[in-house]
A protein has these predicted regions:
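Cytosolic, long alpha-helical scaffolding segments
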Residues: 1-253
Length: 253
């Protein structure tokens, strides 16, 4: 429970911060509010929400955000680009949920038995959650950089290259999550090795935009950068999978 007090009365910005916090977190609700007291309480039993379900939910949201950012650029859909930006809070909320669950587990060993999870696996879930949150952030950057050029006539070759790079990036994302849930070290290694194809295409995009006007060159360059970073973050998930499997194989020290 969080209890906020003041000797006088809360200024409007404090109440806004409290509302924003309640909206961006899972289960945290204002249960008492006066001029000088605000009480926030967790109304959700976090132990009843499996880590696996949350990760899968985050994956679907982040991947859809990425795909929609590219679709918005291709179809000149401003409302879709704006919606991608708004969805970022959904990923942030779920990342916060896993962070809170992990913190609870580290402080109370009995929760490990209740949630049927080890501290090692919980920490790896948290790491993967953070990485997915970063992939969502790059989808937002793609959508934000789409908006200034959305109504311009983008070179078809550049658009095709962005779509190809995006497809490779999300294939990496798919494989990284699959390798995690399947505990597949070989697939995780193959995923890491495949990043070179994505990096090559993103390099080609950066060369293509040199012939474009400054506005297009800048924003397409940022889009390509975020597509590449999403793929690289996916490789980070694969590296996490490998580390987890090695730890399991070696057992406790």
């Amino acid at each position: 429970m969080i209890r906020l007090t003041t000797k006088q009365r809360f200024p409007p910005f404090v109440r806004k911060v409290v509302r924003d916090f309640s909206q961006m977190t899972v289960g945290q609700e204002v249960v008492e509010e006066t001029e000088s007291v605000i009480v926030i309480k967790n109304l959700l039993d976090l132990t009843e929400i499996p880590f696996e379900n949350t990760i899968k939910h985050m994956f679907v949201i982040a991947k859809t955000m990425h795909d929609d950012a590219v679709t918005a650029l291709e179809t000149r859909n401003m409302s879709l680009a704006e919606d991608v930006v708004k969805r970022d809070m959904d990923v942030d909320r779920l990342n916060w949920l896993i962070a809170r669950q992990t913190n609870m587990i580290m402080q109370n060993a009995s929760l490990l038995r209740k949630m049927r999870i080890s501290t090692t696996l919980a920490m790896h879930y948290y790491i993967i959650s953070w990485i997915i949150e970063r992939i969502g952030d790059h989808a937002v950057r793609m959508a934000e950089n789409t908006q200034p050029i959305i109504y311009l006539d983008l070179d078809k070759k550049i658009l095709a290259a962005i779509k190809k790079a995006s497809s490779l990036s999300m294939e990496n994302f798919d494989r990284s999550i699959i390798s995690f849930f399947n505990a597949d070290m070989k697939d995780a290694n193959r995923n890491i090795e495949s990043i070179h194809s994505l990096e090559a295409i993103c390099g080609e995009i950066n060369n293509m935009v040199l012939k474009q006007d400054t506005l297009v060159a800048i924003h397409v360059g940022y889009i390509a950068e975020s597509v590449r970073r999403a793929g690289e973050y996916s490789c980070d998930i694969s590296e996490t999978v490998i580390n987890l499997l090695i730890e399991k194989e070696n057992g406790p020290p």
